[in-house]
């Protein structure tokens, strides 16, 4: 559908809508592929977008070859809808916060462990939850002008939708025999702790936010069409449902001690605030796998919890 095989969502609004809610629309873009579009303000991800992602995966698993998540706007997503979280925090509704974080995590994990290929097509701002969703896709089709980053630190929280877990997993995958593992861990920790945003898809790959199997596209107008082709390629290669990882190497107490010393000296040097220290320690705790007496191997779910 669209011009010369290009996917143009605007042209499909009257004929090819499969499902919609207030924040998302699910289109049939032909060849048994679906496309989920966000249309909240700045494409932020609140409850309606989480519902949309889950619905899209359910529909695709029943009747389609796979799913693209992407839109034709300037930005893929400015991240999770934090307004809602701050409101709940202000009202001290911490159980509600835990539930919404859990729902977000479960949705990210579902994107990765569904029975169909999920390709995320990114462009422009792809921040926070937008980055986390990309990190959990089977593949990303990134426009070269994709500005990606786990920016939650900047607003005083840790990336809790699976971004911290995913950085820990990718750190573990980078370890080679004889490597100074703590140095690699520190580098990836700093990507989160400085809320660094990549200025291009190539830089996002260098930062470890995109995988070497993710693809880059120069032409913005062909982004969704290329993402659709990626879905079909994955399907035709005999896509099989993945199993959750159980072999993520974490450093335990040895890593934690290194981080705590560094973070405390930054606090005393007045480089960071007391709250920054709290968030940095929490991130380090997750990335080191908690208070383990020695380095070991843990599962994805262990890190999320």
Give the predicted meaning of each segment:
Residues 1-70, 170-200, 212-214, 218-305:
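Intrinsically disordered, low-complexity segments enriched in small/flexible residues
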Residues 31-36, 50-95, 105-121, 143-147:
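A structural preference for short, pocket-lining loop segments at secondary-structure junctions
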Residues 37-40, 89, 152, 208:
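Short, histidine-centered active-site or binding-site loop motifs used for metal coordination
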Residues 42-43, 47, 93-101:
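Short acidic-aromatic active-site loops that bind/stabilize oxyanions
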Residues 42-43, 75, 125, 157:
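Short strand->helix junction
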Residues 45, 80, 137:
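Single, functionally critical "micro-switch" positions that shape active/binding sites
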Residues 47-50, 79, 131, 161:
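Conserved strand-to-helix beginnings and helix N-cap segments that scaffold or border functional pockets
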Residues 97-101, 105, 109-246:
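Conserved catalytic cores of soluble enzyme domains
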């Amino acid at each position: 559908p669209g011009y010369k095989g290009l996917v143009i969502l605007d042209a499909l609004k009257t004929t090819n809508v499969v499902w919609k809610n207030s924040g998302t629309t699910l289109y049939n873009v032909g060849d048994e592929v679906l496309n989920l579009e966000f249309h909240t303000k700045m494409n932020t991800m609140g409850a309606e977008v989480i519902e949309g992602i889950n619905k899209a995966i359910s529909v695709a698993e029943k009747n389609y070859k796979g799913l693209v998540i992407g839109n034709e706007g300037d930005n893929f997503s400015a991240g999770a809808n934090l307004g809602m979280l701050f409101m709940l925090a202000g009202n001290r509704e911490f159980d509600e916060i835990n539930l919404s974080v859990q729902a977000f995590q479960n949705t990210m994990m579902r994107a990765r462990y569904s029975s169909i290929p999920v390709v995320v097509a990114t462009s422009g701002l792809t921040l926070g939850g937008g980055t986390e969703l990309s990190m959990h896709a089977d593949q990303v089709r990134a426009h070269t002008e994709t500005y990606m980053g786990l920016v939650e630190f900047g607003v005083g929280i840790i990336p809790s939708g699976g971004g911290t877990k995913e950085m820990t997993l990718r750190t573990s995958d980078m370890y080679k025999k004889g490597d100074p593992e703590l140095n690699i861990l520190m580098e990836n920790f700093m990507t989160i702790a400085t809320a660094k945003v990549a200025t291009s898809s190539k830089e996002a790959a260098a930062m470890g936010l995109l995988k070497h199997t993710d693809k880059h596209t120069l032409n913005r107008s062909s982004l969704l069409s290329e993402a659709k082709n990626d879905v079909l390629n994955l399907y035709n290669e005999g896509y099989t449902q993945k199993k959750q990882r159980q072999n993520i190497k974490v450093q335990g107490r040895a890593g934690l001690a290194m981080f705590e010393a560094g973070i405390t000296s930054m606090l005393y040097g007045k480089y960071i605030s007391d709250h920054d220290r709290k968030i940095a320690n929490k991130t380090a705790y997750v990335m080191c796998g908690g208070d383990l007496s020695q380095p070991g191997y843990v599962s994805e779910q262990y890190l999320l919890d």
